[in-house]
């Protein structure tokens, strides 16, 4: 890590981080929540397939 740049206060304020992921495409930080639609869609489809497969296994 020899190539390091010290960030100014203005540059630091533009960084958004510390968001919490709920594992289904929903993220929240201390100001707002948002949805990653691709991740949410994948989570929903995965849940549907899992439910369908477990239903077949119970037959």
Swiss-Prot record:
Residue ranges the record assigns to the propeptide: 1-18
NCBIfam families xref list: bacteriocin_sig
Family the UniProt entry places it in: Belongs to the bacteriocin class IIA/YGNGV family.
GO terms (BP aspect): defense response to bacterium; killing of cells of another organism
Keywords on record: Antibiotic, Antimicrobial, Bacteriocin, Disulfide bond, Secreted
Matches recorded under InterPro entries: Bacteriocin_IIa, Bacteriocin_IIa_CS, Bacteriocin_IIa_dom_sf, Bacteriocin_signal_seq
Function: Bactericidal activity; inhibits closely related Lactobacilli, Listeria monocytogenes and ivanovvi, Enterococcus faecalis, Carnobacterium sp and Brocothrix thermosphacta.
Gene that this polypeptide is encoded by: sapA
Designated name of the protein: Bacteriocin sakacin-A
Keyword Secreted: yes
Naturally occurring in which organism (per UniProt): Latilactobacillus sakei (Lactobacillus sakei)
Top-level lineage group: Bacteria
Cysteines engaged in disulfide bonds, as pairs: 28-33
GO (cellular component) term, any one: extracellular region
Compartment annotation: Secreted
Main subcellular localisation: secreted
């Amino acid at each position: 890590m020899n190539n390091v740049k010290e960030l100014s206060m203005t540059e630091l304020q533009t960084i958004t981080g510390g968001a919490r992921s709920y594992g289904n495409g929903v993220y929240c930080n201390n100001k707002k929540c948002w949805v990653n639609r691709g991740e949410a869609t994948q989570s929903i489809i995965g849940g549907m397939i899992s439910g369908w497969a477990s239903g077949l296994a119970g037959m």
